[in-house]
């Protein structure tokens, strides 16, 4: 392999490495509670049943998170107990029980779009509600 071919190959590899690193780093941005506060919906796949939630930026000390409002009882169809709070994480949004234990971690897929894969192959999707 010629020197110029080796150099060209190395440049391509480095470009791929840096672009992958940049996209991975951008997906691990820790958003603040105030950035995420607002109205959200959670549903399984495209099922008609939708849970309407409100992520609030007021702290819930015993859960080490922020207040979760709306129809939280609706979430018990997928969770072992009703979540009391939430918190932003570098990977997404965690729904928490009263003591702060994470019940579900929804991974960030894009702006206002968070998802988790269920054991049965279904997917839960949390989306920012549009006004």
UniProtKB/Swiss-Prot annotation:
Range of residues in the leader sequence: 1-26
Keywords, comma-separated and alphabetical: Disulfide bond, Metalloenzyme inhibitor, Metalloprotease inhibitor, Periplasm, Protease inhibitor, Signal
GO function terms (MF aspect): metalloendopeptidase inhibitor activity
Cysteine pairs bridged by disulfides in the record: 51-74
Subcellular location: Periplasm
Domain of life: Bacteria
Gene3D superfamilies according to UniProt: 2.40.128.10
GO CC term, one of those recorded: periplasmic space
Pfam families with a match to the protein in the record: Inh (PF02974)
InterPro entries: Inh, Inh/Omp19, Protease_inh_b-brl_dom
UniProt record similarity statement: Belongs to the protease inhibitor I38 family.
Role noted for this protein: Inhibitor of the alkaline protease. It forms a non-covalent bond with the protease and may prevent its autocatalytic cleavage in the periplasm.
Name of the protein this chain belongs to: Proteinase inhibitor
Source species: Pseudomonas aeruginosa (strain ATCC 15692 / DSM 22644 / CIP 104116 / JCM 14847 / LMG 12228 / 1C / PRS 101 / PAO1)
Classification lineage: Bacteria, Pseudomonadati, Pseudomonadota, Gammaproteobacteria, Pseudomonadales
Recorded name of the encoding gene: inh
């Amino acid at each position: 392999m010629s020197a110029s071919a080796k150099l060209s190959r190395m440049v391509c590899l480095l470009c791929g490495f840096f672009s992958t690193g940049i996209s991975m780093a951008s997906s691990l941005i820790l958003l603040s509670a105030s950035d995420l506060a607002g109205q959200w919906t959670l549903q399984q796949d495209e099922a008609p049943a939708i849970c309407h939630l409100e992520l609030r930026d007021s702290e819930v000390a015993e859960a080490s998170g922020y207040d979760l409002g709306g129809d939280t009882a609706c979430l018990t169809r997928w969770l072992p107990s009703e979540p009391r709070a939430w918190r932003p994480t570098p990977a997404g949004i965690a729904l928490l029980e009263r003591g702060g234990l994470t019940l579900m971690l929804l991974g960030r897929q894009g702006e206002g779009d968070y998802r988790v894969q269920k054991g049965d192959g279904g997917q839960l999707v949390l989306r920012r509600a549009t006004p």
